[in-house]
Amino acid sequence: MPERRLTALLYRTGGQMVLIDCGEGTQVGLKLAGWGFKSLSAILFTHFHADHVAGLPGLLLTLANAGKTEPLCLFGPPGLEEVVRGLTVIAPALPFDLHLCKLPEESNCTQRLGELFIQSAPADHRIPCLAYSLEIRRAGAFDAHRAQAQEIPIEYWSRLQKGETIWHQGRVFDSGMVLGESRRGIKVTYCTDSRPAGSVALLARDSDLFVCEGIYGEDEKRDGAVGKKHMIFSEAAFLAKESRCRELWLTHYSPSLKDPLEYIDCARAVFPNTKAGFDGMSKTICFE
């Protein structure tokens, strides 16, 4: 539909940004977000249908014009190298390197990007497709009394908080000696172009935010979604409920679905904290 942009989700944390999918014109949406371009450090592709990848050349050229020089990491299922090679024919000379990381299509995989843990899991679509979770893990609180009781020199406390192991005068100090139980971090999961799958439910477990496709709103169109390997609203809601997510955003609507809000109750009947996504929708998630 003319008023809807193609697929992309932008995640920002700790001075870096990560993009999931890059539909045509994604650079326009990023410009409207007002977060700049140079801190984009990675793009995660769910799969290689055009509405999820065709925006890559334009975005790469926009990043170059913005003065980006740091490497850009591209993650995706098998076929990543061939797709990127083809799309970058019209963006051949970039002032930054592209680092490609092909992810397995039939098993989970975890990558680390700074403080961010990126986990992929198989989705169920017509071609190899992945769902992603982005997680900031949080260590337990520092216990000064425990550190003092074990006579750990104060100059090592901050290093132990960062997870280092330290040798000192024949003794070994590690973070487990001074940190409590791990605290809840922040987790966002993204799934599009898939039938409901157990692998996605496990990936999304305990997410603060689950962004999931709902190609059709009404349950009567389920057979059509099955044939195209997509989900309807109520199926996305069941996934959110099964995964014990805190909030569900629906996205990736069929062009035939003019007003997603007309059918939002089909999802809310299953998972009450469901919202119909729209272009530019955003949320800030903080540690508890």
How would you name each of these model-derived features?
Residues 1-35, 69-71, 132-134, 180-191, ...:
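Conserved beta-strand hairpin/beta-sheet module of binuclear metal-dependent hydrolase folds
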Residues 2, 113-190, 194-203, 209-211:
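Active-site-proximal loop/helix segment associated with metal-binding centers of metalloenzymes
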Residues 14, 40, 66-71, 242-249:
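Short, surface-exposed connector motifs at secondary-structure boundaries
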Residues 20-23, 40-48, 76-77, 189-194, ...:
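Active-site neighborhood of phospho(di)ester-bond hydrolases with catalytic His/Asp-centered motifs
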Residues 24-75, 99-104:
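Active-site metal-binding motif and surrounding structural segment of the metallo-beta-lactamase
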Residues 55-62, 84-87, 258-266:
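Metal-dependent catalytic neighborhoods of phosphoester/phosphodiester hydrolases
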Residues 79-91, 100-106:
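A gly/proline- and charged-residue-enriched helix-loop-helix capping module
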